[in-house]
Amino acid sequence: VKILRFERKDEAVAWAKKIIGIDGMSGDVTAISLLDDKGEFLAVTVFSAYTGTNIDMHIAARPKSHWLSRSFFNASFELPFRVLEVPRVTGLIRAENLNAQRFVSRLGFQYEGRMRKAFPDGGDLMLYGLLREEYLKHPWSENETTRGTTRSQGDISSDRVPP
C-alpha cells in the first residue's frame, strides 16, 4: 500500500468522480491517493474550491475494500490543516448517500445543512464541516497531544445521520 501526494492527480480525480458519481468540482482540483500493491486506486481524497478559509473535500474508495488507516487519514488532512492552514474543510454529500454521511460523521465532521435541489436531477446536497481544532483533537490526528493513541473506526464518533 502506498500513499501518493499529488502524483497521478488527473487520473485520481477522474477515478474519484466515477466512484462518487459526480461530474464537476469547482476551482483548482488536487488529490491524495492510496494505492494497492498493484498500483491501483484504493481510495482518493479530492480537494476543490479553495477559498483561503475553506476547501471542499471529497473522499472516494473502492467498494468493499479495507482502506482507512491512520496514515491515510492524516495524509488527507495534512493539505488543508497543516499546509494551507484553513480553519475548516467542507464535505458535500448527496442526500441519498447515507453510508457517506455516516462515514464523515465518524471522522468527526458535523452536519451543517441541506441544499435542496442542488443537483441537476433535483437531488439534495448535505453539507458537513470539520474545523481545524476538531481535527487536531481527533484520536487519529498526528498531533503531539494525541500521538500514539488508537481507536477503531466504529468508535470515532456517532453514527447519527441528519434527516
Language-model-derived ranges and their functions:
Residues 96-113:
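Conserved active-site alpha-helix within GNAT-family acetyltransferase domains
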Residues 6-54, 63-64:
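Acetyl-CoA-dependent GNAT
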Residues 48-59, 85-87, 124:
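A conserved beta-turn-beta hairpin within the catalytic core of GNAT-like acetyltransferases
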Residues 92, 110-125:
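Conserved catalytic-core motifs of GNAT/GCN5-like acyltransferases
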Residues 68-76:
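Conserved acetyl-CoA pyrophosphate-binding loop and the N-cap/start of the following alpha-helix
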Residues 58-68, 94:
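A short, internal acetyl-CoA/4′-phosphopantetheine-binding micro-motif in the GNAT/acyltransferase core
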Residues 82-93:
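Conserved GNAT acetyl-CoA-binding A-motif
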Residues 118-163:
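C-terminal "cap" of GNAT-fold acetyltransferases
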